[in-house]
A protein has these predicted regions:
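Acidic, serine/threonine-rich low-complexity regulatory regions at protein termini
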Residues: 1-20, 24-204
Length: 204
């Protein structure tokens, strides 16, 4: 939906049609047995016909050039978490904290200024710092393609979101999810006051 809307101006009264058409595409892509088109018409209270949904589906696919797979923050996060865990002992707390930070970033419009890989690497750096671990390494630079200096602004933005989450009443679902023992209660962890400048210039 987001990719289509970033390319095409859509009137408000067509948003629901775009939404169900994108759900249809996603279900065909992800599910073994995709729901019938009539089911998508039904959830719109039959506001749209089968033909309208199919026409809109074609428009979305044509606009995206049938390119449906785009790397996300999570795609890179998995790779960088493995790279970090290959060097120093890390438990699930690290993985869950990095994932929680990534979810906070997904909900903040200001983070659209950064590439998904940039955000993922910054989430790893901040999570390592918050857990008192070495923040970066040659291995992480190799697998991420970023140096600490290149991550500074994005990492500070990630840290600010983590800090803000301690007092903000927004995003209760993410905080509740990661406050569960299943996720090591990472959303309840204390947040450091700031990210010191020296971690972005370790050679200095």
């Amino acid at each position: 939906v987001d990719r289509f809307l970033s390319l095409v101006d859509v009137k408000r009264n067509r948003l629901q049609l775009i939404g169900v058409s994108c759900m249809l595409i996603a279900s065909k892509y992800e599910e073994i047995y995709a729901p019938q088109i009539e089911e998508f018409c039904y959830i719109t209270d039959n506001t749209y016909t089968r033909e309208q949904v199919l026409t809109c589906e074609k428009q979305v696919l044509d606009t995206l050039g049938f390119d449906l797979t785009q790397p996300t923050i999570k795609t890179f996060l998995r790779r960088f978490i493995k790279a970090a865990a290959g060097e120093i002992p890390l438990d699930l707390t690290f993985e869950f904290l990095a994932s929680y930070l990534a979810e906070l970033c997904l909900m903040d419009y200001g983070m659209v200024n950064y590439l998904p890989s940039h955000i993922a690497a910054s989430c790893v750096l901040v999570a390592l710092w918050e857990l008192g671990k070495p923040c970066w390494s040659q291995t992480l630079s190799f697998y991420s393609g970023y140096t600490p200096a290149e991550l500074q602004h994005c990492a500070q933005a990630v840290h600010s979101l983590f800090k803000l989450s301690k007092t903000s009443k927004e995003l209760p679902a993410a905080k509740e999810k990661y406050g569960n023992g299943k996720f090591c209660k990472v959303s309840t962890m204390a947040c450091s006051a700031e990210l010191p400048g020296y971690i972005f210039n370790p050679a200095a």
